């Protein structure tokens, strides 16, 4: 490719509404242009990267035995009604009516359609296993689209769905997809972790996220440096304490804490460590009777140590909270506790309030908590003496650095990540709700065991940039760079020798199957170099009259601090030796 025949449209400054590095650099480098909130056009150089990502994904999916198809972007409500997700999906699913007033949606995912295909086409166990995948546009009407392609409304995704005869076979399909994902992210050249994860709204009981490591990542990843343990912080278990609870050493006292409504403020006022305080969080569940009519509200008091944070995913697994919960209103809190948030505690609480203590709190003695009276806290609080043991003890908190690893092989560390892939074992969640069955060898109908596997193709671009950039621009991994090599002739319009040598190298690299661009725009060197550093091409060769006099050219990798002088006779071979394999 010659730059004069290509479309290069770089900007000196990013638009003022660009938030994160990847968004700013993709706009400045001419990869994307904003059309509406969360919706972008991909310019030729951006689409070039997308196609390279898609090629790697498609290659590994095919290698793993998956079969590509395409399902409709527009899907009828009837299929989604079968699983109950027409209502469950909420406002993120964009719904509309056609001219006949029939309900449709722009699909955010395709479990319903692919399950419908399976129940119509896969009649016998002899046709199993099957794994169907597509690479297609999706739409999710995010409440607040942000971070460019990282959290857009329209995006490209690879979604795959496996169908198996039993749990064991489904496990093999899951493992095959997990291995394929590892190969995909290895080939993409990204630093990543596969972490155990919560299954969320999709359901199922086995799940892993593939997280690209980046300081700007939205997700917290918990891992053990001394082992293979890794999990999303939503799932990572805080182990029960081995030490037994200490005996009470203090008397219970009601202590004035005027205007101190947080554990941090109380600890500072009293001159005590934050970890001696207990935080009270009030949740509520809306009860219904057998006819699904409202039947009152149950209030729950969840207790975590003052220096810990509540993990809402873990809270949602408590019996009684699994069907859904919300934070209690101030009115509900006042009715049960007699005061407002900031001074709440478990001592003397109405028996109708269910008390759930985090494992750490259940092991505490002489702790500080709210007195259920404005401007007062209790010190020297002890279980069994000052209040009954909690109704339930559970793992309620987020992991913190230094907690013991659940696999017993060291202490946990935390890093940030960007989720770019997710694999789920679904079981029969969808096949049962849609009555999707096949006949086994005895002629009896059985529900398919299913898995689903997603990769955010366009999200990978943003994640790769968040992980790989510097002050000058993007630093693409070789495998997905828009061009792997750029040849920069200095004095293209003035020197026959420069044009000859630059063209010769360009044609040699092209003949070797190397993805190279020749910058024949006759720009000033500073402009030319700045453009390609911003765009992020990993390898640059500069050919100019000064070097040609000595029979030399300059090579510089995008991460290199300085250029190296290479003899012209060795130049093509040298550049080839620097390129990472992409297959």
From Swiss-Prot:
GO terms for cellular component: cytosol. The keyword Cytoplasm applies. Its EC number is 6.1.1.15. One of its GO terms (molecular function) is aminoacyl-tRNA deacylase activity. Pfam families: HGTP_anticodon, tRNA-synt_2b, tRNA_edit. GO terms for biological process: prolyl-tRNA aminoacylation. PROSITE patterns: AA_TRNA_LIGASE_II. It catalyses: tRNA(Pro) + L-proline + ATP = L-prolyl-tRNA(Pro) + AMP + diphosphate. It is found in: Cytoplasm. Its main location: cytoplasm. Keywords: Aminoacyl-tRNA synthetase, ATP-binding, Cytoplasm, Ligase, Nucleotide-binding, Protein biosynthesis. SUPFAM superfamilies: Class II aaRS ABD-related, Class II aaRS and biotin synthetases, YbaK/ProRS associated domain. It comes from the Bacteria. InterPro entries: aa-tRNA-synt_IIb, aa-tRNA-synth_II, aa-tRNA-synth_II/BPL/LPL, Anticodon-bd, Anticodon-bd_dom_sf, Pro-tRNA-ligase_IIa, Pro-tRNA-synth_IIa_bac-type, Pro-tRNA-Synthase_IIa_type1. Consists of three domains: the N-terminal catalytic domain, the editing domain and the C-terminal anticodon-binding domain. PANTHER family: MITOCHONDRIAL RIBOSOME PROTEIN L39/PROLYL-TRNA LIGASE FAMILY MEMBER (PTHR42753), PROLINE--TRNA LIGASE (PTHR42753:SF2). Catalyzes the attachment of proline to tRNA(Pro) in a two-step reaction: proline is first activated by ATP to form Pro-AMP and then transferred to the acceptor end of tRNA(Pro). As ProRS can inadvertently accommodate and process non-cognate amino acids such as alanine and cysteine, to avoid such errors it has two additional distinct editing activities against alanine. One activity is designated as 'pretransfer' editing and involves the tRNA(Pro)-independent hydrolysis of activated Ala-AMP. Belongs to the class-II aminoacyl-tRNA synthetase family. ProS type 1 subfamily. Homodimer. This is Proline--tRNA ligase.
């Amino acid at each position: 490719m010659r730059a004069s025949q290509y479309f290069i449209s770089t900007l000196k400054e990013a638009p003022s509404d660009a938030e994160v590095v990847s968004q700013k650099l993709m706009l400045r480098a001419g990869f994307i242009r904003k059309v509406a909130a969360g919706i972008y056009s991909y310019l030729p150089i951006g689409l070039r990267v997308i196609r390279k990502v898609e090629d790697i994904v498609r290659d590994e999916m095919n290698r793993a035995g998956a079969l590509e198809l395409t399902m409709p972007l527009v899907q009828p409500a009837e299929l989604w009604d079968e699983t109950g997700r027409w209502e469950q999906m909420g406002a993120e699913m964009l719904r509309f009516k056609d001219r006949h007033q029939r309900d449709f949606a722009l699909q955010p995912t395709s479990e319903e359609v692919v399950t419908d295909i399976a129940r119509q086409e896969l009649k016998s166990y002899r046709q199993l296993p099957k794994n169907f995948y597509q690479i297609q546009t999706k739409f999710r009407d995010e409440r607040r689209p942000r971070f460019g392609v990282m959290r857009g409304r329209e995006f490209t995704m690879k979604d795959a769905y496996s169908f198996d005869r039993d749990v064991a076979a489904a496990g093999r399909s899951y493992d095959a997809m997990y291995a394929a994902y590892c190969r995909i992210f290895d080939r993409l050249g990204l630093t990543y972790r596969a972490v155990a994860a919560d299954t969320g709204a999709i359901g199922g009981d086995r799940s892993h996220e593939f997280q690209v490591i980046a300081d700007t990542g939205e997700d917290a990843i918990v891992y053990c440096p001394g082992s293979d343990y890794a999990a999303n912080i939503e799932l990572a278990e805080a182990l029960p304490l081995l030490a037994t609870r200490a005996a009470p050493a203090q008397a219970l006292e009601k202590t004035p804490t005027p205007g101190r409504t947080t554990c941090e403020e109380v600890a500072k006022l009293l001159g005590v460590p934050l970890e001696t305080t207990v935080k009270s969080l009030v949740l509520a569940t809306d009860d219904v009777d057998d006819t699904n009519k409202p039947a009152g509200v149950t209030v729950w008091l969840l207790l975590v140590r003052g220096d810990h944070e509540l993990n809402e995913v873990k809270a949602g697994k408590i019996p009684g909270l699994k069907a859904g919960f919300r934070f209690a209103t101030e009115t509900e809190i006042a009715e049960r506790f007699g005061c407002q948030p900031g001074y709440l505690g478990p001592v003397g609480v109405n028996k109708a309030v269910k008390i759930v203590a985090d494992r750490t709190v259940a092991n505490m003695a002489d702790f500080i908590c709210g007195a259920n009276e404005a401007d007062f806290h209790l010190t020297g609080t002890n279980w069994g003496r000052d209040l009954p043991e909690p109704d339930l003890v559970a793992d309620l908190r987020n992991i913190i650095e230094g907690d013991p690893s659940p696999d017993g092989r060291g202490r946990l560390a935390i890093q940030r990540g960007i989720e770019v892939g997710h694999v789920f074992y679904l079981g029969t969640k969808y096949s049962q709700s849609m009555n999707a069955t096949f006949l086994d060898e005895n002629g009896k109908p059985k529900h398919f065991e299913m898995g689903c596997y997603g990769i955010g193709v366009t999200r990978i671009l943003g994640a790769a940039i968040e992980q790989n950039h510097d002050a000058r621009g993007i630093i693409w991994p070789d495998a997905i760079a828009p061009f792997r090599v750029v040849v920069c002739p200095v004095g293209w319009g003035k020197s026959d020798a420069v044009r000859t040598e630059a063209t010769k190298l360009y044609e040699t690299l092209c003949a070797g199957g190397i993805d190279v661009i020749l910058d024949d725009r006759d720009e000033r060197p500073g402009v030319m170099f700045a453009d390609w550093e911003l765009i992020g091409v990993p390898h640059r060769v500069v050919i100019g009259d000064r070097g040609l006099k000595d029979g030399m050219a300059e090579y510089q990798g995008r991460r290199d601090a300085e250029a190296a002088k290479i003899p012209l006779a060795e130049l093509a071979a040298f550049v080839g030796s620097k390129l990472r394999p992409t297959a």
